[in-house]
């Protein structure tokens, strides 16, 4: 999930994007095979622990892992069994959170996918007309303000010589996602009415070639975004590996701790304490689907 994932905000967003992609692909996979499931409401970035798929009346919690190193991706293609020795990880705080049941299902998935994270890689992607999604992440004072009050009127200004379309993303009073698209004329400023209680990120369809400024008029707080202060959070993956599943009760019975800072297949260094079962000890996903069809789950 976003905040416990650690790393740069753009790395965290890429992992969140990968998780959303896995969830959507899983639902499509179920639909194509006429496997019945319920949708409980998509999990937003602001509360990614909220599950969205129920199988046989049981909560299905998908734990997805983005594998973005070329060497690992090549190894997974040459020898898919390499992931059998990887740990199936669940963050300890997530596992212990309220609202879980021992009947919950943990489903583990790997998404091998490249990222274009550096400025040079991003320029190559844009020049080649490949898919990309450019965002700038706002500081914590904008994303998670100390007091939950309206931000007030926002003023956005562009120093570019051509018009630019931006999408502002944040939260409203009820902490639901709020998106607003605004076009900024060349070297002009645009005032945005009071619509946000927090502002998390700004998305630009085209790479800005000049600075963009945003000011919170009520707090008189300004934030400048340089032409190189954007990250590409697109994940270039074509397939997803559904590694296996366990009930939460069985997972907790078998799991051993993996402490913060440990090196594992998925991460150079884990950011939080996890519980883990080896992937080789998971039950095959085919068994899960068969039990759903036979109503024996």
Where are these regions (language model features)?
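Active-site beta-strand termini and strand-to-loop segments that position acidic
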Residues: 53-57
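Nucleic-acid endonuclease domains
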Residues: 1-50, 64-297
């Amino acid at each position: 999930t976003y905040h416990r994932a650690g790393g740069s905000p753009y790395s965290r967003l890429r992992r969140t994007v990968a998780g959303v992609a896995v969830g959507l692909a899983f639902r499509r996979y179920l639909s194509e095979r006429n496997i019945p499931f319920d949708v409980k409401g998509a999990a937003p970035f602001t509360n990614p622990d909220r599950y969205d798929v129920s199988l046989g009346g049981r909560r299905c919690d998908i734990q997805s892992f983005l594998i973005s190193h070329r060497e690992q991706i090549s190894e997974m293609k040459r020898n898919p069994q390499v992931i059998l020795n990887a740990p199936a990880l669940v963050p300890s705080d997530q596992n212990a959170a309220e609202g879980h049941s021992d009947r919950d299902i943990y489903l583990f998935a790997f998404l091998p996918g490249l990222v274009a994270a550096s400025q040079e890689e991003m320029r190559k992607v844009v020049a080649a007309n490949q898919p990309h999604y450019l965002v700038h992440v706002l500081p914590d004072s904008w994303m998670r303000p100390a007091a939950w009050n309206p931000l007030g009127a926002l003023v956005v200004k562009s120093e570019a010589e051509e018009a630019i379309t931006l999408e502002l993303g944040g939260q409203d009073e009820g902490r639901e996602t709020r998106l607003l698209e605004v076009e900024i004329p060349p070297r002009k400023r645009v005032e945005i009415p009071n619509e946000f209680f927090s502002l998390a990120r700004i998305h630009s369809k085209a790479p800005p070639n000049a600075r963009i400024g945003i000011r919170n008029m009520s707090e008189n707080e300004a934030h400048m975004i340089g032409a190189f202060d954007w990250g590409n959070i697109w994940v270039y993956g074509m397939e997803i590996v559904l590694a296996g599943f366990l009930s939460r009760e069985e997972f907790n019975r078998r799991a051993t701790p993996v402490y913060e800072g440990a090196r594992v297949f998925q991460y150079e260094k884990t950011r939080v304490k996890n519980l883990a079962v080896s992937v080789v000890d998971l039950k095959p996903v085919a068994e899960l689907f068969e039990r759903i069809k036979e109503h024996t789950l």
